Structure formats: structure tokens, C-alpha cells
Amino acid sequence: QVARIHAVGVLVVDEIQHLNRARGTGKEDLLNFLVTLVNTIGIPVILIGTLGAVRTLTGDFRQARRASGLGSMVWERLSRADGWDYFVTRMWRYQWTQEHTPLTEEILECLYDESQGIIDVVIKLFMLAQMQVIQLRRGRGRPETLDAKLFRHIAKENFKLISPMINALKRGDREAIIKYDDI
């Protein structure tokens, strides 16, 4: 009733993978609550989480059936062959530098290598690189251009915490990747 009174069109539950850490009956109780909610609320309920959520949501058929509702989608990292060039080309339009740098094959390859197709990582890499060249121009009079060397430097300096995960993806090390269930 509260959802209808306030004209809620959709309920989004984000970070559902954190249920994996729930102790005791807390996890089961919350999953049962979500199933009941989906059955009674009368509006779409969207559950969002990393791949770590799959273990939780597919624990038994009832939860898997409810979690998939009208369908489920797993959004994985982009492969170099499938959608990467399209995505980066569209992102590349959002250059805020004074000098527009053309997108080259070398830059495309570098961005993929440093992000391994993870959209969040490549966006942050693109943003941080632009911030750096804009600051360097103001401080040292350098041109505001982007290149592969800059992107590699930015990744090395700013992505130290995620470098083990990125390196595991680069190597195709399945055992290491499994340890990081939220990639």
C-alpha cells in the first residue's frame, strides 16, 4: 500500500551481493522477505549486485525463480571483439581537453589492456587522464593531449588496489579470478 500511495514505479535493491556475508538466519530471512515483497508489492523489484550475488540468489529454486522474475541479465566486461570499440568511441566524445586527441588503435588497445573491458574502470581511467593533462597544462604549460603512455601511467599510479584483479583477468587465471567474486 505504501508503494501505491507514494506512486513508486519500481523498487531497486542494490549491492545484493552483501547478503553473502550475513550470519545466521539473517540471509534467509531477508531473501524470504524479498520473495514475499515481490509477490505482494505489485511493482517491479530489480535486484542489482556483482557476480557474487549469483551464489546467494541461486541457492534454491524458489529464490532463483523469484530473482529472475521477468528475466535476468548478467552484465559482464566487454570483450575486445564485442562492443569495446563502439563503447570507447562513444565515450571518447566526452573529452574536456582544449586539444581534441583522435582515438587511435594504440589508445583503444591500451585502454582495454588497463581496464580489461570493465566499463567502470575505463571511464575512471579516461576521466583521471583528462584531469591530469588539464592540471599539467595549467601548472607547466604542457599540451592537453591524451596518449597510451599517459593512460598506462595513470593506471599504474591510481589503480594499485585493483591491479591484482586486472592482472588476473589479463592472465586468464581462473583461480585468481574466482577469489574476486565482485569483478
Where are these regions (language model features)?
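The catalytic "switch" region of P-loop NTPases
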Residues: 2, 7-9, 18-23, 30-106
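Walker B catalytic acidic pair
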Residues: 14-16
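Short, solvent-exposed segments of well-ordered alpha helices
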Residues: 25-28, 113
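Amphipathic alpha-helical segments in well-structured domains
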Residues: 27-34, 144-148
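C-terminal alpha-helical "lid" subdomain
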Residues: 77-183
